[in-house]
């Protein structure tokens, strides 16, 4: 909501009164800046650079734009990852067969981060923290094996829920007129429904909120499309929601199972006033037009050096 919490300090480059020149730092990037400031204040020199590998991991995993400071952080952080002496990160790279391979932002986003995140989605997030902080090689290796297994379980659970959700949507013609897809299933895994909501949003190019029902309570995770502020939509429907939080493109909420039909109706009435048919058509975003002769190894290397 557009209110700052009552706290001693709220450090966020997105604050309306912030003069910081770059507003798209990930949370881990903001913490990195705080550590940097503390190192200056306490005369600790460049000790803050010891955390660059972690900051790079978190920045890519948080899917913030890799531009400006984020690009610099990730570029230098990747160099630190490749030469890391950290037991946990080294074992993770070994297990993923990246001990002697170049590492890129793709490697972090699609190889390392899913395994680290699997701990919080499927099991206990503290396991991932332990991996990143342990000095014991055997413990690190055991944790990496566990995270691999949990990531495989996450993948299979995701496929199963996605299949069920798509079947519900495609077998019910009433979803054709809905601009916001509200889909609920019995005891769907809370740690995975956000990922599945993203998949459904991509498939149908419609905002989607996926709910897991249990004991007459529905816990949901939603994803949206450009032009539809999901948080504002939930504010509009707040009378039917027990609690919620989020931002323009993603949100989490809890609703009574009895209120789900009314919630679906209300949020779609709101969407009808915001979205038109053109908004529901996927748009191809073109970053730049280039000539064939510009597609050279030299130019690729030059771009990588930026």
Residue ranges and their predicted role:
Residues 39-260:
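Hydrophobic helix-and-loop "lid/oligomerization" segment in the mid-to-C-terminal part
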Residues 4-44, 48-60:
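Short alpha-helices
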Residues 63, 86, 269-306:
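A contiguous loop/helix-start segment that scaffolds small-molecule binding in enzyme catalytic cores
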Residues 1-4, 17-19, 215-218, 228:
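Short gly/pro/ser/thr-enriched loop/turn and capping motifs at secondary-structure boundaries
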Residues 4, 125, 193-195, 264, ...:
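Conserved strand-to-helix beginnings and helix N-cap segments that scaffold or border functional pockets
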Residues 35-37, 259-262, 267:
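Cysteine-nucleophile active-site neighborhood
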Residues 234-238, 264-271:
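Short amphipathic alpha-helices in soluble, non-transmembrane regions
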């Amino acid at each position: 909501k557009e209110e700052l919490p009552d706290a001693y300090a709220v450090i966020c480059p997105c604050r309306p009164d912030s003069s910081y020149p770059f507003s798209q730092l990930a949370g881990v990037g903001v913490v990195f800046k705080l550590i940097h400031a503390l190192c200056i204040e306490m005369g600790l020199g460049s000790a803050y650079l010891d955390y660059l590998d972690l900051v790079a991991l978190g920045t890519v995993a948080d899917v913030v734009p890799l531009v400006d400071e984020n690009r610099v952080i990730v570029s230098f952080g990747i160099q630190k990852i490749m030469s890391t002496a950290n037991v946990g990160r080294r074992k993770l790279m070994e297990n993923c067969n990246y001990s002697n391979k170049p590492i890129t932002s793709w490697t972090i986003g699609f190889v390392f981060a899913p395994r680290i995140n699997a701990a919080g989605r499927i099991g206990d997030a503290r396991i991932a923290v332990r991996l990143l902080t342990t000095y014991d090689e055997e413990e690190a290796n055991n944790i990496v094996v566990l995270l691999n297994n949990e990531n495989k379980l996450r993948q299979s659970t995701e496929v199963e829920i996605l299949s069920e959700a798509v079947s519900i949507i495609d077998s019910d013609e009433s979803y054709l007129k809905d601009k916001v897809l509200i889909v609920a299933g019995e005891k769907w895994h809370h740690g995975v429904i956000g990922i599945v909501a993203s998949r459904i949003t991509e498939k149908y190019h419609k905002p989607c909120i996926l709910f897991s029902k249990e004991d007459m309570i529905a816990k949901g995770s939603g994803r949206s499309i450009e032009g539809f502020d999901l948080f504002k939509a939930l504010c509009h429907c707040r009378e039917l929601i027990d609690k919620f939080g989020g931002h323009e493109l993603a949100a989490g909420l809890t609703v009574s199972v009895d209120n789900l039909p009314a919630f679906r109706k209300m949020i779609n009435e709101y969407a009808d006033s915001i979205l038109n048919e053109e908004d529901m058509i996927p748009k191809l975003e073109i970053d730049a037009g280039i000539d064939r002769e510009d597609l050279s190894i030299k130019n690729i290397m030059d771009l990588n050096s930026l």
